[in-house]
């Protein structure tokens, strides 16, 4: 198109269609902006393959342009620092890349002058609700508006990622007396011993807190906390020093950062504070290092260190009152005593006629038993894990076990273990059987495999009827024990059953009915021919295909004022890719079977060309229609409509097309019967012809 005046020309990189932005190359083309204001020609933007070409590749009608955006960004690597603007038309968005900021501003200014575009008023708000893609900073600004308006627009138009963030003041500048902080700095925390002049409430702190198990939790002290608005009468002066609320309602001191011993420890073993400090401390019981023996302090340190979280009131442990302090001091060397006390047997019977091996055993740990009742171990007795136990230790153990009182100690085990035991006496008999065999009485004979082939058969009591299975592994014991008397004693440790065969691995007997074969994985079979899984080929999602340059904080949009410049009707030559003519075709009736169109007429719109409006595409269809008409020549009823349709397709008369849009049922049935009759006659003719030739 050479009728218009050339306003601007130069090299620009053009984007492919929106659905091919990332897969197709951005071609460098020679663009020419023409204005038909003086010549009467339409305003167009043409681009050529090079600056010497005479025929444009495409003509963009600026009358269809709706908006121009300048200062876009694209997340493609080669366009990180590019100057991108777009021309938004009715049919497509053209993204153009300029070589410099000046070129981009020049093109945008010229296009806006021709189209009559002005900066949009709602543009400063658009970046806040625009695309979800995060825009990147652009190294340029638009100079189509005054500098003052640009500064004002840029200050208002910045989305949240680009706004200046006002940092809050440093925590050091804020006084702690304003509001309690969520976090405390370790710089402001101090840890020291209580002073004599401190309040009665603070004197209840244990003096060993800075050297015992609470070294990792500093005792927070802040001098400014005395001015807190929460301080009523000086009694709650240290409420601000802790980052979590106190553990009890009546306690607001810093004792929440220390480990609070349960109430049960303070009955007979712990030396209490003065009554005044105990009342001030509420439910908390503490003790000081100077008062009390070294054995008690050592025992309590073991207790406090071994718990990460204080137990609930229903799960506290009771220490037997008959144990002397020396016994506690000796037993404090055992690491497993505070956590897992050994199981408790019933009252011991005279043991003069039993051997040491049959009458006594070392208490078992938590991994060997799940009983809900335990007794403390004898003083000075450590759980031996060897295969032999001296007679002296066994006698001492039996003596201590028979002379001490036993107390029930609830244990924090899962409910499925403890709830399954009904009676203590029957339960303990079951425990002794489980320790020896691991199964009920009905299953002992069929599941038991003796370790020693020469051992006599097993003898068991008839009271073992409840089928309970040991969750941990249970060793097989030789059949030399008297189970009727053995059930009344402390169960032997796990290693006692392997004295005759220490190399035999442990075996857990399971009923045959409970055994299920593992599932068979056929895919593990060697040389198995399996059909490969179908390839999961997914088309690119829409957001990946339509990923386009996005708006940045300095993007400016220009659009036409609809009141001053109404949109003109869409011309027919908007989709032309090879046209250089500005003439418009007023024919709006689309006839796909017309062989005279789109071959010589270059102004055919895209829908005609896309549907095959050229003469090479129409010729096969025309032959097909002629062949179809030849099939109906024998029927006089259907011939006139077929002739009318043939002539109508060539003359493109609207009334003849309407006759074929409305379907007549009688005519359709008549046409069908005629076609079937002709087909039968033709087939019979073709079958007779070869026979005549053969004769």
UniProtKB/Swiss-Prot annotation:
The modification Phosphoserine is found at residues 251, 253, 266, 304, 403, 455, 652, 684. Residues 204-229, 306-387, 453-659, 671-695 are annotated as: Disordered. The keyword Metal-binding does not apply. PROSITE patterns: PH_DOMAIN. The gene is Gab1. It comes from the Eukaryota. This is GRB2-associated-binding protein 1. Expressed in the inner ear (at protein level). Expression is detected in the cochlear duct, spiral limbus region, efferent and afferent nerves, and in spiral ganglion neurons (at protein level). The lineage of its organism: Eukaryota, Metazoa, Chordata, Craniata, Vertebrata. GO terms for biological process: cellular response to vascular endothelial growth factor stimulus; epidermal growth factor receptor signaling pathway; epidermis development; heart development; interleukin-6-mediated signaling pathway; labyrinthine layer development; MAPK cascade; platelet-derived growth factor receptor signaling pathway. Gene3D superfamilies: Pleckstrin-homology domain (PH domain)/Phosphotyrosine-binding domain (PTB). GO terms for cellular component: cell cortex; cytoplasm; cytosol. Residues 5-116 form the PH domain. The modification N-acetylserine is found at residue 2. It comes from Mus musculus. Adapter protein that plays a role in intracellular signaling cascades triggered by activated receptor-type kinases. Plays a role in FGFR1 signaling. Probably involved in signaling by the epidermal growth factor receptor (EGFR) and the insulin receptor (INSR). Involved in the MET/HGF-signaling pathway. The modification Phosphothreonine is found at residues 388, 639. The modification Phosphotyrosine is found at residues 628, 660. Residues 206-229, 314-334, 457-466, 605-617, 686-695 have a biased composition (Polar residues). GO terms for molecular function: signaling adaptor activity.
């Amino acid at each position: 198109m050479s009728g218009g005046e050339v306003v601007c020309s130069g090299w620009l990189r053009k984007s492919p269609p929106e659905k091919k932005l990332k897969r197709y190359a951005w071609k460098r083309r020679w663009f020419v902006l023409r204005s038909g204001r003086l010549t009467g020609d339409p305003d167009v933007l043409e681009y050529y393959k090079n600056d010497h070409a005479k025929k444009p590749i495409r003509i963009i009608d600026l009358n269809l342009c709706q908006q121009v955006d300048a200062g876009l960004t694209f997340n493609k690597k080669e366009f990180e620092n590019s100057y991108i603007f777009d021309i938004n038309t009715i049919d497509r968005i053209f993204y153009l890349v300029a070589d410099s900021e000046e070129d981009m501003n020049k093109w945008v200014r010229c296009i806006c002058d021709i189209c009559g575009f002005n900066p949009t008023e709602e543009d400063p708000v658009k970046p806040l609700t625009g695309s979800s893609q995060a825009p990147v900073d652009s190294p340029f600004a638009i100079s189509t508006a005054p500098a003052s308006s640009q500064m004002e627009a840029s200050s208002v138009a910045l989305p949240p990622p680009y706004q200046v963030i006002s940092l809050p003041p440093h925590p050091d500048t804020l006084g702690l007396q304003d509001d309690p902080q969520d976090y405390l700095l370790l710089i402001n925390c101090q840890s020291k011993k209580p002073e004599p002049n401190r309040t009665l409430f603070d004197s209840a702190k244990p003096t060993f807190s800075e050297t015992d198990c609470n070294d990792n939790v500093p005792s927070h002290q802040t001098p400014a906390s005395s001015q807190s608005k929460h301080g009523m009468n000086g009694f709650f002066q240290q409420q601000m020093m802790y980052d979590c609320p106190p553990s009890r309602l009546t306690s607001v001191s810093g004792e929440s950062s220390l480990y609070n011993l349960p109430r049960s420890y303070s009955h007979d073993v712990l030396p209490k504070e003065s009554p005044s400090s105990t009342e001030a401390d509420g439910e908390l019981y503490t003790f000081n290092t100077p008062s009390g023996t070294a054995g008690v302090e050592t025992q309590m340190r073991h207790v406090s260190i071994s718990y990460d979280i204080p137990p609930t009131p229903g799960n506290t442990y009771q220490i037997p009152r008959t144990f002397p302090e020396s016994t506690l001091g000796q037993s404090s060397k055992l690491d497993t005593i505070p956590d897992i006390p050994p199981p408790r047997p019933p009252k011991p019977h005279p043991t003069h006629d039993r051997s040491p091996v049959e009458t006594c055993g070392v208490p078992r740990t938590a991994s060997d038993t799940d009983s809900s009742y335990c007794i403390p171990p004898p003083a000075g007795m450590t759980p031996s894990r060897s295969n032999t136990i001296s007679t002296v230790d066994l006698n001492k153990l039996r003596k201590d076990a028979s002379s001490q009182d036993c107390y029930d100690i609830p244990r924090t085990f899962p409910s499925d273990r403890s709830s399954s035991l009904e009676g203590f006496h029957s339960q303990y008999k079951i425990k002794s059987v489980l320790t020896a065999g691991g199964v009920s009485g009905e299953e002992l004979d069929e599941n038991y495999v003796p370790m020693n082939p020469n051992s006599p058969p097993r003898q068991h009591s008839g009271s073992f009827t409840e089928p309970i299975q040991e969750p941990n592994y249970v060793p097989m014991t030789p059949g030399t024990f008297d189970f009727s008397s053995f059930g009344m004693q402390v169960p032997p440790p796990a290693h006692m059953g392997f004295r005759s065969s220490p190399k035999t691995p442990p075996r857990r007997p399971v009923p045959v009915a409970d055994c299920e074969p593992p599932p068979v994985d056929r895919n593990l079979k060697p040389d198995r021919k399996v059909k490969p899984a179908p390839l999961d080929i997914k088309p690119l999602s829409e957001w990946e295909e339509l990923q386009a340059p996005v708006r940045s904080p300095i993007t400016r949009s220009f659009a036409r004022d609809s009141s001053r410049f109404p949109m003109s009707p869409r011309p027919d030559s908007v989709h032309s890719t090879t046209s250089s003519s500005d003439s418009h075709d007023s024919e709006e009736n689309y006839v796909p079977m017309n062989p005279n169109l789109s071959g010589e007429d270059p102004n055919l719109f895209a829908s005609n060309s896309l549907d095959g409006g050229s003469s090479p595409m129409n010729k096969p269809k025309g032959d097909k229609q002629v062949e179809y008409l030849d099939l109906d020549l024998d029927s006089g009823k259907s011939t006139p409509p077929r002739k009318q349709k043939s002539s109508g397709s060539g003359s493109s008369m609207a009334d003849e097309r309407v006759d074929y849009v409305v379907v007549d049922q009688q005519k359709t049935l008549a046409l069908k019967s005629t076609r079937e009759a002709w087909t039968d006659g033709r087939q019979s003719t073709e079958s007779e012809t070869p026979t005549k030739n053969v004769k």
